[in-house]
Amino acid sequence: TKTADVIRDVSTDKSQIGILYLNEFNEKVLTKLFRDAGLEFTELFSCGAYAYVWKNHPLANREEISIQDLQEYPCLAFEQGNSNSFYFAEEIFSTYDYKRVIKACDRATMLNLMVGLNGYTLCSGIICEELNGSDYRAIPLEQKERMHIGYVMRKNEIMSPICRKY
């Protein structure tokens, strides 16, 4: 889901919550957008960034990896539609000058490109094998930028029981 869509869906009551991340680069802009939309951000946890690769990627056996190590491989990023501001990018390091970037709209395409092209994406390191299978690895990045994972809700809204369970 596109970041701008998450903000719009929560602010218009289409969704009760939206899961997003803040980092040093996007925090001021997104916090202002949350405020303007009547939303508040609640941090769940913070974490470092990871490179997400196919298990047979040439770098898959590394214990840690740098952005420079990944230069020769295509970076896979989620398409952000008309809201293509760097601040809306779902991937951390959105301003880094990657040699090759391929944009996709869905997880299945992303996973296929990881296998077919030895591509990678950047993520929080939280991997759900039930969704993605066991053929992928998350490798910590040497860069120590923090991601603050959390949710946005409309201000003063009480979380529903189903939302709380989620």
Name each model-derived stretch:
Residues 35-42, 46-48, 108-158:
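Beta-alpha-beta core module
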